[in-house]
Regions:
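Extended boundary segments
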Residues: 90-137
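Alpha-helical transmembrane segments of integral membrane proteins
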Residues: 6-14
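Extracytoplasmic/periplasmic soluble domains downstream of a signal peptide or transmembrane helix
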Residues: 2, 6-7, 20-38, 117, ...
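Hydrophobic alpha-helical transmembrane segments of multi-pass integral membrane proteins
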Residues: 14-17, 60
């Protein structure tokens, strides 16, 4: 009886450990699937629009942006926008599907496509990218500077985890309505103190005549005491492919992205082998014990 209870306890501990180890991988895959569905729904809503609808949406967005002489940035981006926006003019622009999705961001080098939501409330940043209310909408144009924020290192989603791999000259793309805008990385500020409001506000301000987007996240990985700002400046989009990875790059990235899954599988196989060996060893001992008892009785 005691041996059965020990086996049951061992099994439960194994399942609990397996669940803890599997959670990041499973939850990240779920978020990836959810993001792909959001983007598909957005693209479907956009494709259902009529030409006059596009004109109306673009005009409303540009009119909203025209009220910004400069970006209104007050301190740190994260957690700065927790108010309910659903009755505001801001919520009404670029909300064609009615779910708060403005468009989506694609970064080929790190193989991500993420929906862009209105605002930077924490519930938004747990699952996707938030547009910082008070900065230019991600629609491009002269004298605009949009700020898009996302977390790094969340157990449930990768989001901007790999954004530190971007270098000057790398490309990212923003899809809004019927337009794709290409941005080339031209500035990276990798260790800005989150309390250095002056530097943050200066780095995120509109520059006269420029069309810029800054990707904003936490750094160092797992510490999050500073901010990483990756700025891109608009360049012509000529319909180029947004896939830059070679087959080898894709394989290496897959290994990197699924390292936890491989670790879990390795641990599972190792534990399975241990359990099988334990079972065979116990069975062998029982047979030996049985033979010894028989010999004792015969004697």
């Amino acid at each position: 009886m005691r041996r059965k209870l020990s086996g049951l306890l061992f099994g439960l501990l194994f399942l609990a450990g397996f669940g803890i180890l599997a959670y990041p991988t499973v939850s990240n895959q779920w978020n990836t699937y959810r993001q792909s569905r959001l983007i598909s729904n957005y693209e479907q809503a956009v494709s259902d629009m009529q030409p006059e609808d596009y004109t109306k949406e673009w005009e409303a967005a540009r009119e909203f942006d025209s009220t910004l002489v400069q970006n209104n940035i007050y301190g740190d981006v994260f957690g700065s926008d927790d108010v309910d926006m659903k009755d505001t003019d801001y919520w009404k622009v670029l909300n064609v599907a009615g779910d708060g999705v403005m468009g989506y961001l694609s970064i080929p080098k790190i193989n991500i496509k993420l929906a862009i939501y209105h605002g930077t409330a924490e519930d938004v940043l747990q699952t996707g990218i938030g547009h910082m209310n008070g900065t230019s909408l991600p629609i491009g144009g002269e004298s605009t500077h949009s700020v898009l924020a996302a977390h790094r290192g969340l157990p449930a989603a990768r989001l901007f985890t790999d954004i530190d791999q971007l270098k000057q000259g790398d490309m990212f793309y923003i899809h809004v309505l019927d337009e794709t805008m290409a941005y080339q990385v031209d500035q990276i500020l990798d260790m800005v103190d989150k309390d250095d409001h002056e530097t943050l506000e200066e780095a995120l301000q509109i520059q006269e005549g420029e069309d810029q987007v800054t990707l904003f996240t936490c750094t160092p990985y797992g510490v999050n005491s500073h901010r990483l700002l990756v700025r891109g400046t608009r360049v012509p989009y000529n319909g180029e492919e947004e896939v830059e990875s070679t087959p080898v790059d894709s394989m290496l990235r897959a290994i990197q992205n699924y390292y936890m899954l491989y670790l879990i599988l390795g641990l599972a196989v190792t534990l399975l082998v241990i359990l099988i060996m334990k079972f065979l060893f116990d069975r062998k001992n029982k047979k030996r014990s049985g033979k010894t008892d028989d010999m004792s009785k015969e004697g």
